[in-house]
């Protein structure tokens, strides 16, 4: 390996980054080495990595299905070229714009930006400007919009076929509205009415046309809410063997009360199902029933053939108390089905870019796996994308994954090489199948899903606390 030196060893806020770089270097190159520089540039020549530490996932596992039978490897280009794999039950969406008073032209322009939905997810956007709602961008906004939504005239359009889009001012005016949690309040209200919600969209994103860049991501998330699937792995390697779960828990920075969330996944066409998000004290009361339903669904799908293992994805920095709780809930099931714990961590903050100096962007191709220790791996899930026009280069930072068997006594044991290979392929496909971002979400689908469940629940909890304090 080689190290690019820019200056002496850093100190202060860069010390932790420097130590992390040294740790990664030591794990990948046991013979030794040093790292320095600020910003940190670390070159790991893959040709110098011992063969048993370097693996490559086959190209067939990178293939995604779009439309009826089209196959692509890039989510954005595949969705824009072929459309969704499994359209939702909606064939048209009635858009209702919630816009600042005096910004009707901006709302009309935003409506026009939604026109590609017809080709992306087989949904035709329609709307009636007479039913759009203008609001004053001040402290009255929440009350005005809440009253307007509750008193909207009855129409023939089912609630599930209506989409509400919140447009907010740019700059300080938007900050004031968000400080009053306007978007959170409206999302909760709209979802309680059985409709769909997108927001908050700033005016500058509408006027500059920047929203068009994000429309494929918005479209893919909308389609999932409508019961469809924007794309899925052409052949999911673990479909007939593994029951998969994602687990997340809240942090004190999100809310004082602790919440936990879990979801289950097996068939790509079904996506995440049997979601559960509860306060930690109540979570254990519902977990067993959700797991039982997911297990029975697997048996139904596979003619009473049970899963060979349960793979649980969680964050690597999961608090110790939450990890112990997860282990306590899972141990009773380890006798019925082997449990594999996959702890993942995004490495984007480590700023380690120069893994392969001879490759485009100094990044190895998607599907590259670098073994750090017996149970820890660096998994590259996306290819480097160079800068194009106004778009910056996309560096696909690797996902750090720690894989262990959960034993009946609560201890963790490393997987065999063959078992680890199977779970790494599964994690690779779950990252690529994630509809949260067409340009590549760095987390497996199930973990991104539980993070979103948890984030929305914590936002609602904060809103409930704020309203309670205001009433007192």
Regions found by a protein language model. Give the residues of each.
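Long, contiguous domain-sized segments
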Residues: 126, 133-140, 148-472
